[in-house]
Amino acid sequence: MNGLHQRFCFLFFILPILMLAQSRLRDHGVEVGVLRPGTLNTITDVPGVKVGQFTLNQGDDIRTGITAILPHSGNIFQEKVPAAIYVGNGFGKLAGYTQVKELGNLETPIILTNTLSVPTAVNAVIGYTLNQPENENVRSINAVVGETNDGYLNDIRGRHITEEHVLKAIENASTGPMSEGSVGAGTGTICFGFKGGIGTSSRVLPKQSGGYTVGVLVQTNFGGVLQVAGVEVGKKLGHYSDSFKYSPDGSCMMVVLTDAPLDSRNLERLAKRAMLGLSHTGGIASNGSGDYVIAVSTAEACRIPYESENPIQNVPTLRNEAMTPLFLATIEATEEAILNSLFAGETMIGRDGHKIEALPKEKVLEMLREAGKLDR
């Protein structure tokens, strides 16, 4: 066998292996929607946004973590950002909801973790905010902390997350590429009966529609009948009945950030569209699911100063008529972020020997190929 033939055989056998090792949906030629993703296809494509994660994967039964999302690099309490929260199904323990609903702004990093670690995360965020320069006189802080219940794989009753873990996630937050799958707050989560986790995606609007970026990050821990690019994957795999075993205490946290100048009213409208993205994947917002969407505008011109001598606030706001492209971007990015969390997931064994298999990507890709959904 000559050298050229040997190299050809090597590539013939190794390329399928490399392809299946790739962890994101688009790496396999599957495109969701019609809008273009950002450079990284992550929430950090939104200028200034930072994400930090702390993964706690120890011993036989600790499978949990922290994911922190910072809308900008400054003092968020002193420079608040417009925000809204939409509740798709309210079986959850989202801290900070009522003040965001009332005032329409966010004043801390957004933290995602497990259900029983919400109080710990709130304490950590309060401490972090109090210690920021210029916050010496602050007496009230609205920490926003979301959660899903990772108790099937994780010893959630052990409450292993500490304030130091939360602070590490915040302090290590950065722009640029980020990890997906079984990392951070997604370490022990389950989605459609397969290993879920953290997923992210982004969309950039055409210049004629404003050129704005929408980024989405999800923590997937919910059930339903999985669909990928419109293909009934869960039904074809005969796996959908298994997904309901894990859904009663499941949830999906969705964080939508955009540099479009939006007020809290239109941010709530934007947040509602994330639920449409969830439904495109086969999610059903079950009785026991806490499906929350946190939407934030990072536009610098829209920031809200903590203190101001001017009682009138002049803030640029996108007109209602310009919202439709942003709605589409949110739907597409949410759908792809959820699927990315599944494609990045790896089989995991956790508490009491419980085992959750990764999505069988080979079988899924073959179904998509047969349905004509692959670009290559």
Q: Model-derived features: where do they sit?
A:
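Bacterial Sec-dependent N-terminal signal peptides
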Residues: 1-22
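Alpha/propeptide regions of enzymes that mature by internal proteolysis
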Residues: 22-376
